[in-house]
Structure formats: C-alpha cells, structure tokens
UniProtKB/Swiss-Prot annotation:
Keywords: Acyltransferase, Antibiotic biosynthesis, Transferase. It comes from Streptomyces glaucescens. One of its GO terms (biological process) is fatty acid biosynthetic process. PANTHER family: 3-OXOACYL-[ACYL-CARRIER-PROTEIN] SYNTHASE, MITOCHONDRIAL, POLYKETIDE SYNTHASE-RELATED. GO terms for cellular component: cytosol. SMART domains: PKS_KS. This is Tetracenomycin polyketide synthase ketoacyl synthase alpha subunit. The keyword Acyltransferase applies. The active site is at residues 173, 313, 350. It is an enzyme of class 2 (transferase). One of its GO terms (molecular function) is 3-oxoacyl-[acyl-carrier-protein] synthase activity. It catalyses: 10 malonyl-CoA + 8 H(+) = tetracenomycin F2 + 10 CO2 + 10 CoA + 2 H2O.
C-alpha cells in the first residue's frame, strides 16, 4: 500500500443534493444545526406499508437546470447525480475541456440504480402489476436505462467529457465509499488525472420500501418521522430510508496546487472487507469492520491517536450500532472512548448506496469548517453503545483527520480516512 505514497489525492469539488435543502451549503447548515429532514412519504401513497417515513428531497429537475428531455426521461437517481456532477465541477474550478478526456475517469456508486423509474414503468405497463407485459410497445424507450445502473455513470461521464475509465460501483450501502476509494486508486495508479466520483440513490419507491418492510429493517415510528432515526439510542427501531447524491472532483494534490485550486480534504486511506457471513446478519465482535478500519489507517499512515472525528455508519438498527461500536473498540482500543463519533443518518435518513459519499462530504466539510455534526435524536443511552456520539448539538473543534465507515447488507465493510490537505507528512 505504501506504493501510493508519492501521489496524494485531494477533493477539489463537491456537489450535494440531500434532504433538507439544495446544495452543499444547505446540506452543511442542516447538519450543523442538528435539524432533521425526515417526514411522511409524499412521493407515493405509502399508507399500506409498515414504514411510511423517509428523508425526501424537494427536487425540481427543470429548476435545477436539467433539460426537458432529462427531466422527463432520466431516472431520479440519474438526475441527482448529473446535477451534483455539474455542481462539483463548477466548485472545483476545473474546465474539463482543458484536460485530456482520456485522462478523466468516472466512478459512481449506487445500491438500487434506477429502481424508481423501473418501478414506475412496470406499474404503468402492467396495470399496477395485475398482468404481465404483453404489448412491448407500451414500454418507454428509456426502460433499458432504468434496468441497468450503468446509465447513471454514462450520463455523468458525458457531463464531464470523460473518455477514461468509467465504472459503476454497486456494493450496497458501502457503494458511495467504495466509489470514492476506487476513484482515488485510479489517480494513485496513474490511470487518470481527474476523477469525478461519488454516489446516488433515489430509492423511495414502492418496491424498495416493500423490500425493507419485509425484513423489518426500517423504522415504524410513523407518528413522529422527525425523531424516527435514532442511531445509538436505546429506543432505536431501524433506519429511515432516504435519498440523495454527493459527487466529488478528485485530483492529484500537486496538480491542484499548480492551478491554484482549493482542496477540501485529502483522501489518505481506503479499505474494504467482507464478513462472508449472512445477507443481513453481522458478527457481534465487529472484526471485519475493525480490519477495514485498521487497513485504511495503515494506508493513510495514521493511527487512532491521530483521529479527531469518526463519521459512523450509524444506521439506527439494533445490531448495526452495537456491531459498529464493537468494531471501533476492537480497532482503536481505549482511544475509541476519546474520539467523537456521530451519524448524519439521524438527520437525513439512509440513502443506501449514496450515503457513503454524503458522509464523506460531511467529513470534508468538518475538516474545512472545524465543526463536528451531531447525532440527532439521541436521548437515552444504550449500555452496549457507550462511546461519545456527539448528542444533538454540533461541536466546534479543530478537525485534521477523519475516519468514515460504512456497512452494507451482504457483509460489506468499508472505511476511508480523510485529512487536512495542507499536512506535509507522508
């Protein structure tokens, strides 16, 4: 892993769409205020479902600058990704036309792809699922795009003029972390000079809500949606579904400095592991997540003593929060009790594949502004979750090095380390 030390990769552009407001500034304002943006589902009639709450985005495709064609034919997840890619490129100050297009890469994560569009079209052509599709002429042209998640990274690649490596990463709820990890590797390995990377998911649709209902993973606290997402709280009863996108522009630090670009954070380390255990179950000792944390810190040439903040997966399920707490203790030892830990899912919900990138955006902004977002709705401690979860109120302090972790159904465990880019030690 030390082979990468000579190439330092930094984030020079950020684009965010999340519940609670459009843009990076609105996202950060919501997090630091400790406000929640979860509410009763309005995107469809969720009355028949067990969980009827979500973190929705007030999103107007035309108002966001998409063309009528993009607004009418792109899946919502694709729309979010394209808008965020545009915002990230603008924020970076980079003109893609000034870069060899073969040296621009794209890495976009998604857990459920274009499920919303697919769900909608299936209902339309099958009379709500009451009959099989017998007349293919009823299907819209973009049905194939809804069927394959590669359509998302294709549109982002076209937006960036990217002719280099382009990929979609789909590793469940770690997709957003993994996509950025892969994008970082493209630059470190010399396969790209610029990578537009991140993740998107718009899973608030009947089929996705039904899937999580079936395994009782989501909160049923429908009478109080603003307080339903309660990571690490003793009374948590599952996660609250969300939607969103975060996209970054990555460059080598020296190239960013040559053009006078602002660097939010350096991607120092990344690692991923699998528990090879169960579709939804987690081993209680947190070993695989702990191994990912240790490997990411090793690649970053950091230790637990260097950490100022941990952005937890913190989904709000009974087993995840216990498992994650155990992983922090296993990997960091006594230091785990001293490092502030928080979960932004308490405020914006769990946007599946997109959440890892949204959390990395929060980490980069924590470094930028010297503020740690809180864990909202934290009221009653769980004896098995006994760390400092930054309850309810943001905390101002210098933040130089941050760990962000993710856990996904299927056993995926990922970790990334971001650091203040002006640091010179390798």
């Amino acid at each position: 892993m030390t082979r990468h030390a000579e190439k330092r990769v930094v984030i020079t552009g950020i684009g965010v769409r999340a519940p609670g407001g459009a843009g990076t500034a609105a996202f950060w304002d919501l997090l630091t205020a400790g406000r929640t943006a979860t509410r009763t589902i309005s995107l469809f009639d969720a009355a028949p479902y067990r969980s009827r709450i979500a973190g929705e985005i007030d999103f107007d495709p035309i108002g966001e600058g998409l063309s009528p064609r993009q607004a009418s034919t792109y899946d919502r997840a694709t729309q979010l990704a394209v808008v965020c890619a545009r915002e990230a490129l603008k924020d970076s100050g980079l003109d893609p036309a000034a870069v060899n297009p073969e040296r621009i890469g794209v890495s976009i994560g998604t857990a459920v792809g274009c499920t919303t569009g697919l769900d909608r079209e299936y209902a339309r052509v099958s009379e709500g699922g009451s009959r099989w599709l017998v007349d293919h002429t009823l299907a819209v042209e973009q049905l194939f795009d809804y069927f394959v998640p590669t359509s998302i990274c294709r549109e982002v690649a076209w937006e960036a003029g990217a002719e280099g490596p382009v990929t979609v990463v789909s590793t469940g709820c770690t997709s957003g972390l993994d996509a950025v990890g892969y994008g970082t590797e493209l630059i470190r390995d010399g396969r790209a000079d610029v990578v537009v990377c991140g993740a998107t998911d718009a899973p608030i649709s009947p089929i996705t809500v039904a899937c999580f209902d079936a395994i009782k993973a989501t909160s049923a606290n429908n009478d109080d949606p603003a307080h339903a997402s309660r990571p690490f709280d003793r009374n948590r009863d599952g996660f609250v579904l969300g939607e969103g996108s975060a996209v970054f522009v990555l460059e080598e630090l020296s190239a960013a400095r040559r053009r006078g670009a602002h660097a939010y954070a350096e991607v120092r380390g990344f690692a991923t592991r699998s528990n090879a255990f169960h579709m939804t179950g987690l081993k209680p000792d947190g070993r695989e997540m702990a191994e990912a944390i240790t490997a990411a810190l090793d690649q970053a040439r950091r230790t637990g003593d260097d950490l100022h903040y941990i952005n937890a997966h913190g989904s709000g399920t009974r087993q995840n929060d216990r498992h994650e707490t155990a992983a922090f203790k296993r990997s960091l030892g006594q230091r785990a009790y001293d490092v502030p830990v928080s979960s932004i899912k308490s405020m914006i919900g769990h946007s599946l594949g997109a959440i890892g990138s949204l959390e990395l955006a929060a980490c980069a902004l924590a470094i930028e502004h010297g503020v740690i977002p809180p864990t909202a709705n934290y009221e009653e401690p769980d004896p098995e979750c006994d760390l400092d979860y930054v309850p309810n109120v943001a905390r101002e302090q210098r933040v130089d090095t941050v760990l962000s972790v993710g856990s996904g159904f299927g056993g995926f465990q990922s970790a990334a380390v971001l650091a203040r880019p002006k640091e010179t030690r390798s």
